[in-house]
């Protein structure tokens, strides 16, 4: 292990728990560090902290006392959701204490190759696609990272034959130093998490940290459909392999409805197991990674054809009386909803949209709304979504929440229609996260059956 000497007998502060914090604390303890865990949730309501204390790890809960950092910590490992303007983080940085996320630990604790996937949309689907295709091609792959499996836990179980396929957020990448994937994928870049990063440029810079330790023997896979992503191609030492649905590139591309890798036919686009132009892009990125790692064409084709998608990401839920239901609750921005709509005949679609009001106008979405059968709108942003619907000349129905919206959409649907939850907004005005929102949609579908 590369990091035993870094942490053994050193004091390390783990700031914030959740899955990644617990994983980091346990790994550091195992490696001989003197670990302190600090979490804002009160101890009596914090079963994870209770479990760590039972196992001999020091825990301080209920607040984040700045005086804690008067101790001689050699390292802070923070939860990626904790911002860099947090007073604890600011004090640590001011004292010269390195601030990592558990992704850095994962890299240092294992010698297996890493495929890292980042971007604004499509990360989870592409990460899952890549892992499934690699496994189908007898290249053992382990999913980890932002997809829900802490990288530092999974890395400890990896064998020499494995590849870690790691979904990476900008928050996670900001807390890395030596992290060095063999292949990095950038799915796309749109303005996201500006409240965290401050500017789009800072957001892109955080994403681009994925490649800063890479060399010419490594590969960066970039979406050449996007100007913002394409511009990064000249800013890396790694070998760039592009993908595109708009032009023939020296990588993976779409031409005449077929997918190719450097001139080699892989499969027809309509064979991909999930709909939408965005999933063609996700498949092309997957094809690049698979070919770079030696997976044959047949395994790629069979795996992508069988791919069933990921929960809350244009997930086909089922049919009731000939009406199809799709759960795309993960679509928390305009681009994601545009991509979702691109896979369907608008005249058959009843779109459920709306959510947290971030002040966005939805003019960019108007061309994609034209021709929709109807829209069901809800949430804080409903008035803004209504204005976009008016411009697209689409009739709307207002709903109180997702359950109400789902029932109202089904009530007006006819055989052959599609009820699509693709909100184009975050969920936090009504729901804790997009997963909870999507689960309400799924539960209502079951009740309607």
UniProtKB/Swiss-Prot annotation:
GO terms for molecular function: ATP binding; UDP-N-acetylmuramoylalanine-D-glutamate ligase activity. It comes from the Bacteria. It is an enzyme of class 6 (ligase). Gene3D superfamilies: Mur ligase, C-terminal domain, Mur-like, catalytic domain, NAD(P)-binding Rossmann-like Domain. It catalyses: UDP-N-acetyl-alpha-D-muramoyl-L-alanine + D-glutamate + ATP = UDP-N-acetyl-alpha-D-muramoyl-L-alanyl-D-glutamate + ADP + phosphate + H(+). Keywords: ATP-binding, Cell cycle, Cell division, Cell shape, Cell wall biogenesis/degradation, Cytoplasm, Ligase, Nucleotide-binding, Peptidoglycan synthesis. GO terms for cellular component: cytoplasm. InterPro entries: Mur-like_cat_sf, Mur_ligase_C, Mur_ligase_C_dom_sf, Mur_ligase_cen, MurD. Belongs to the MurCDEF family. Cell wall formation. Catalyzes the addition of glutamate to the nucleotide precursor UDP-N-acetylmuramoyl-L-alanine (UMA). This is UDP-N-acetylmuramoylalanine--D-glutamate ligase. It comes from Streptococcus suis (strain 98HAH33).
């Amino acid at each position: 292990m590369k990091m035993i000497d870094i942490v053994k007998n050193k004091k390390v502060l783990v700031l914030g728990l959740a899955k990644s914090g617990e994983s980091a604390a346990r790994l550091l303890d195992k490696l001989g560090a003197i670990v302190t865990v600090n979490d804002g949730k009160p101890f009596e309501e914090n079963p994870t902290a209770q479990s760590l204390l039972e196992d001999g790890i020091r825990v301080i809960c209920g607040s984040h006392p700045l005086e804690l950092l008067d101790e001689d910590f050699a390292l802070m490992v923070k939860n990626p959701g904790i911002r860099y303007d947090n007073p604890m983080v600011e004090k640590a940085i001011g004292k010269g204490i390195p601030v990592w996320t558990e992704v850095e630990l994962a890299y240092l604790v294992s010698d297996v190759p890493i495929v890292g996937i980042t971007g604004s949309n499509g990360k989870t689907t592409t990460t899952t696609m890549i892992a499934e295709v690699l496994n189908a091609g007898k290249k053992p792959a382990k999913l980890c990272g932002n997809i829900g499996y802490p990288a530092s836990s999974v890395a400890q179980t990896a064998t020499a034959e494995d590849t870690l396929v790691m979904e990476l957020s900008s928050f996670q990448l900001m807390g890395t130093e030596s992290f060095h994937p063999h292949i990095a994928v950038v799915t796309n870049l749109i303005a996201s998490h500006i409240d965290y990063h401050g500017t789009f440029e800072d957001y892109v810079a955080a994403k681009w940290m994925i490649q800063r330790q890479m060399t010419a023997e490594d590969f960066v896979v970039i979406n050449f459909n996007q100007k913002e992503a394409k511009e990064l191609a000249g800013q890396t030492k790694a070998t760039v392999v592009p993908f595109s649905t708009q032009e023939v590139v020296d990588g993976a591309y779409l031409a005449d409805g077929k997918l190719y890798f450097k001139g080699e036919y892989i499969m027809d686009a309509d064979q991909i197991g999930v709909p939408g132009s965005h999933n063609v892009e996700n498949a092309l990125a997957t094809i690049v990674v698979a070919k770079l790692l030696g997976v044959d064409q047949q395994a790629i084709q069979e795996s992508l054809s069988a791919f069933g998608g990921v929960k809350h990401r244009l997930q086909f839920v089922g049919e009731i009386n000939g009406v199809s239901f799709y759960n795309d609750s993960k679509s928390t921005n305009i681009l994601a909803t545009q991509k979702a709509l691109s896979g369907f005949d608008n005249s058959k679609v009843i779109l459920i949209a709306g959510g947290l009001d971030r002040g966005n106008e939805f003019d960019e979405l108007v061309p994609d709304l034209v021709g929709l059968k109807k829209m069901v709108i809800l949430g804080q942003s409903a008035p803004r979504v209504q204005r976009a619907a008016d411009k697209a000349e689409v009739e709307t129905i207002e709903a109180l929440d997702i359950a109400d919206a789902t029932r109202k959409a089904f009530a007006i649907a006819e055989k052959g229609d599609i009820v699509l939850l693709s909100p184009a907004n975050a969920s936090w005005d009504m729901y804790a996260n997009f997963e909870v929102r999507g689960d309400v949609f799924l539960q209502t579908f079951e009740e309607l059956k």
